[in-house]
């Protein structure tokens, strides 16, 4: 959340029904050929026009960059000066209550700092968003609509909010364990039990969100944080900048094109009204990555990537799939089904035998595998763009750049070409 022009923003939802923030201080299954007709002859069409924890003990080293610890380059100002610079941007009400410790992330219109409550010495994170910019305001409003309503162990918690005419300061719990993405890259192997433990926590959070009428719409390993660096850490869902929040009884269908290409559901690609089942598709992709270190759908060419997704075309060839249990594959298959009506719900996924048994029927051995070049490339680009050497984070404010987002224009062109082929 927070990159200035990197996201297609969601439509604003209706009024929310619950506010659990402590305080707000205002300014004084089926065959995967549902879209077979859509992707016919797509090969004849040219490519579509294209258009922060930072390092932790689990974050992979940046390729080609020597590990010199956290020593700042000579040109970098002293840490105290940097902290003072950002402290000056904070409303006096905030600094009277919280001691600004370090900048831990930034985006085009947001900054995230690690702070300490002056009275209790409890650490928190504060996200400062520049709401004078339209996109910053819209993303902020979207995230607040969700965070003011939720209280769940596996969802990032909002503590309080301070508002001025040009900025919003969101005080949030601090997660220090890094992203799931980083552990996937650095760890190199997971047992099936490891994977089911992660998925149980994420599914429980998603089930809770869906029961409230909230659809995340951008679930991926980068948006799943470990609460602390230990192996027994819980997982926290974060980054609700693209989320849709609706009251019970409202129309549950959404139309906004948004998300990250490799995790986007087929029905979004064809610009059909969709439901919260898009989150379940993304969880299928995440499960596949956890077990194999590769993505089920990946291609540098967006047209070919979208074609794979529309067909639900993925395979279990090569390592480590011969060592993966049939129950694990069945779990993935029931999520990566092109027909959203046949996809498992979060509750059904939690009750799947593989998850319930914590993969008891699997061999419990590490699934040794090489990480795909796609994931390594993404990790490398993120290393180069990381702005902080701290290992603490709350809610992401950067990481996803323009090239990693689904673009409305791309899908308009994709649909136009389909219509021309279909009508011709």
UniProtKB/Swiss-Prot annotation:
Topology term for the membrane: Lipid-anchor
Residues at the active site: 218
Intracellular or extracellular location(s): Golgi apparatus; Cytoplasm, Cytoskeleton, Microtubule organizing center, Centrosome; Nucleus speckle; Endoplasmic reticulum membrane
InterPro entries membership: Kinase-like_dom_sf, Prot_kinase_dom, Protein_kinase_ATP_BS, Ser/Thr_kinase_AS
Gene Ontology CC terms, in alphabetical order: centrosome; cilium; cytosol; endoplasmic reticulum membrane; Golgi apparatus; nuclear speck; plasma membrane
Region Disordered, annotated ranges: 59-79, 378-408
Major site of localization recorded for this protein: Golgi
Enzyme class: transferase
Residues annotated with Phosphoserine modification: 380-381
Subunit-structure text: Homodimer.
EC number: 2.7.11.1
Pfam families: Pkinase (PF00069)
Domain of life: Eukaryota
Record PTM text: Autophosphorylated on serine residues.
Known catalytic reactions: L-seryl-[protein] + ATP = O-phospho-L-seryl-[protein] + ADP + H(+); L-threonyl-[protein] + ATP = O-phospho-L-threonyl-[protein] + ADP + H(+)
Identification of the protein by name: Serine/threonine-protein kinase H1
Organism of origin: Mus musculus
GO molecular function: ATP binding; protein kinase activity; protein serine kinase activity; protein serine/threonine kinase activity
Family in the record: Belongs to the protein kinase superfamily. CAMK Ser/Thr protein kinase family.
Binding site for ATP: 104-112, 127
Compositional bias segments (type: Low complexity): 381-398
Function: Serine/threonine protein kinase that may be involved in the regulation of pre-mRNA processing. It may phosphorylate components of nuclear splice factor compartments (SFC), such as non-snRNP splicing factors containing a serine/arginine-rich domain (SR proteins). Reversible phosphorylation of SR proteins may cause their release into the nucleoplasm and change their local concentration, thereby influencing alternative splicing.
Activity regulation (UniProt): Activity depends on Ca(2+) concentration.
Keywords: ATP-binding, Cell membrane, Cytoplasm, Cytoskeleton, Endoplasmic reticulum, Golgi apparatus, Kinase, Lipoprotein, Membrane, Myristate, Nucleotide-binding, Nucleus, Palmitate, Phosphoprotein, Serine/threonine-protein kinase, Transferase
Cytoplasm as UniProt keyword: yes
Keyword Zinc: no
Disulfide bonds: none
């Amino acid at each position: 959340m927070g990159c200035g022009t990197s996201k297609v923003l969601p439509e604003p939802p209706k009024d929310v029904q619950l506010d659990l923030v402590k305080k707000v201080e205002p300014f004084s299954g089926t065959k995967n050929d549902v879209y077979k007709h859509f992707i016919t002859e797509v090969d004849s069409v040219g490519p579509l026009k294209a258009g922060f924890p930072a390092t932790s003990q689990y974050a992979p080293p940046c390729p080609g960059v020597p590990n010199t610890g956290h020593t700042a380059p000579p040109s970098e100002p002293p840490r105290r000066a940097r902290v003072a610079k950002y402290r000056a941007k904070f409303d006096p009400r905030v600094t009277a209550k919280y001691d600004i410790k370090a900048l831990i992330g930034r985006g085009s219109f947001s900054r995230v700092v690690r702070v300490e409550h002056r009275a209790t010495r409890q650490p928190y994170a504060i996200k400062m968003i520049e709401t004078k910019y339209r996109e910053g305001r819209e993303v902020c409003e979207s995230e607040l609509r969700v965070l003011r309503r939720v209280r769940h162990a596996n969802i990032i918690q909002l503590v309080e909010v301070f508002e001025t005419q040009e900025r919003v300061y969101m005080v949030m719990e601090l997660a220090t364990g890094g992203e799931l993405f980083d552990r996937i890259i650095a760890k190199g192997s997971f047992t099936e039990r490891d994977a089911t433990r992660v998925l149980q926590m994420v599914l429980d959070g998603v089930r809770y969100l869906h029961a409230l009428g909230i659809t995340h719409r951008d679930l991926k390993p980068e948006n799943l944080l470990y609460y602390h660096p230990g192996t027994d850490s819980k997982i926290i869902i974060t980054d609700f900048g693209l989320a849709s929040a609706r009251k019970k009884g409202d129309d549950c269908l959404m139309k906004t094109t948004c998300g990250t290409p490799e995790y986007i559901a087929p029905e979004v690609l064809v610009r059909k009204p969709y439901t919260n089942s898009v989150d379940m598709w993304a969880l299928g992709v995440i499960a596949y990555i956890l077990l194999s270190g590769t993505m089920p759908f990946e291609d540098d060419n967006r047209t070919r990537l979208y074609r794979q997704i529309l067909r639900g075309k993925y395979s279990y060839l090569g390592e480590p799939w011969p060592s993966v249990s049939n129950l694990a594959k069945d779990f993935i298959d029931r999520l990566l089904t092109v027909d959203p009506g046949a996809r498992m719900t979060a509750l059904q996924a939690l009750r799947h035998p593989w998850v319930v048994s914590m993969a008891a029927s699997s061999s419990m051995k590490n699934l040794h595998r090489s990480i795909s070049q796609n994931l390594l490339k993404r990790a490398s680009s993120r290393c180069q763009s990381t702005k902080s050497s701290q290992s603490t984070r709350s809610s992401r404010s950067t990481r996803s750049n323009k090239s990693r987002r689904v673009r409305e224009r791309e899908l308009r062109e994709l649909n136009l070409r389909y219509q021309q082929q279909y009508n011709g």
